[in-house]
């Protein structure tokens, strides 16, 4: 290693100019085959899979701010598949499998760390519900099991098993639970897409949707008009507003979702620990910081500002689980905007507008679905609207057909 450093130090060409991973923006073309609205994880993943596996490269990603700067940058990077319904378990399990291979596929380290997730049960009713979830997960290949207090103590020795009002009775242990660097995921997909000819246009806001009859023909942006054959909507918390511009309604309500992080400390917590009764989850990052999150704010609001009220609530509940955390200092707090459905499942697939495809309703669980969402949306677009089997249960029509996919019981702390 020292000889390699010496060689570079004596080289006249070092440091050398290197090509940027993501090319600088260019002028908008007048026409694209596909326009993807939203430059977050889902948007760039869809573009990546369109280009790599379907040969569709005349694609423009339009992002009103910057790459991965919305909910992709604001989530707490939890990856899991221990959901309640067969539809949900199959979908998120497929996403976990893709996450496991992303670093190799990108040749780019997304810092994927599979450390397991532990969800605490504080009542007999929750224990029964967890037993059902464990069996559903096992049936579809997930590594999930119900464990007792002794096993919990061995997994997380620092956890307080006897909070004053809510003693821990059991836990749902999900071995596939993991984390990854959310910005690395977005950049990996964007790099792979742009290297194959996809254009990423940041600071480009879509202000209107162009239609002829019931068919989308293009979009209007702050940089001009673009004609296109298809549009993919992937704008997270602003999904209902954009759909309204296209001429239809989505059954979504936007809520702020807050999280916070402490000063870094020595490693003491390997698994991700959550409690739906306490409305709180805690994890330790690779840098030693403690990330604390919980449920969405109780009021609908398009705001990404944090609040003292939720800060006090989350900190109190985190200290119930780990009392020694009262000695730590809080570094920062932030919020994102979630687009919640009534059944806590996404809306994916066709819309009432021809060639206008929906990727919405991700609430607090969008990051963990990024790879499989991009894969299935790319297949949907490339096939001209043939909905993949995996996302058929998440169609918009399920609300009018009373075929909801109820995952509310599996989103511990609304996550």
Segments and roles (model prediction):
Residues 319-415:
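C-terminal catalytic lobe of FAD-dependent flavoproteins
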Residues 221, 225-270:
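Central helical "cap/lid" subdomain
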Residues 1-34, 52-57:
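Extreme N-terminal leader/targeting segments of oxidoreductases
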Residues 51-72:
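Glycine-rich FAD pyrophosphate-binding loop
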């Amino acid at each position: 290693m020292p000889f390699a450093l010496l060689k570079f130090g004596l080289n006249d060409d070092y440091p050398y100019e290197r090509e940027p991973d993501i090319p600088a923006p260019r002028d908008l073309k007048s026409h694209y085959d596909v326009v993807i609205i939203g430059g977050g994880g889902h948007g760039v993943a869809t573009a990546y899979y369109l280009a790599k596996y379907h040969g569709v490269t005349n694609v423009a990603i339009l992002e009103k701010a910057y790459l991965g700067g919305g909910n992709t940058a604001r989530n707490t990077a939890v990856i899991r598949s221990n959901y309640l319904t067969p539809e949900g378990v199959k979908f998120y399990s497929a996403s976990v499998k893709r996450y496991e291979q992303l670093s190799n596929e990108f040749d780019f380290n997304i810092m994927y760390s599979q450390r397991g997730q532990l969800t605490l049960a504080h009542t007999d009713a929750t224990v029964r519900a967890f037993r059902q979830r464990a069996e559903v997960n096992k049936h579809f290949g997930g590594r999930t099991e119900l464990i007792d207090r002794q096993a919990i103590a061995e997994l997380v020795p620092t956890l307080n098993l006897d909070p004053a009002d809510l003693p821990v009775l059991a836990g749902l242990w999900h071995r596939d639970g993991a984390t990854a660097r959310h910005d690395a995921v977005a950049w990996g997909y964007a790099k792979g897409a742009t290297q194959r000819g996809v254009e990423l246009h940041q600071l480009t806001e879509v202000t209107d949707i162009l239609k002829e009859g019931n068919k989308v023909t293009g979009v209007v942006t702050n940089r001009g008009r673009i004609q296109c054959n298809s549009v993919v909507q992937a704008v997270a918390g602003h999904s209902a507003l954009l759909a309204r511009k296209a001429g239809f309604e989505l059954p979504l309500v936007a809520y702020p979702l807050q999280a916070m992080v402490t000063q870094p400390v020595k490693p003491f917590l390997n698994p991700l620990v959550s409690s739906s009764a306490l409305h709180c989850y805690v994890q330790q990052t690779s840098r030693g910081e403690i990330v604390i999150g919980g449920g969405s704010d109780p009021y609908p609001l398009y705001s990404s500002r944090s609040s003292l009220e939720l800060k006090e609530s989350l900190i109190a509940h985190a200290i119930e689980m780990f009392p020694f955390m009262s000695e730590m200092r809080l570094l920062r707090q932030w919020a994102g905007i979630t687009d919640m459905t009534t059944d806590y499942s996404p809306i994916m697939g066709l819309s009432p507008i021809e060639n206008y495809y929906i990727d919405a309703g991700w609430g607090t669980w969008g990051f963990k679905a990024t790879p499989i969402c991009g894969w299935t949306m790319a297949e949907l677009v490339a096939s001209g609207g043939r909905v993949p089997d995996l996302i058929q249960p998440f169609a918009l029509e399920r609300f009018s057909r009373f075929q909801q996919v109820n995952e509310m019981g599996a989103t511990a702390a609304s996550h």
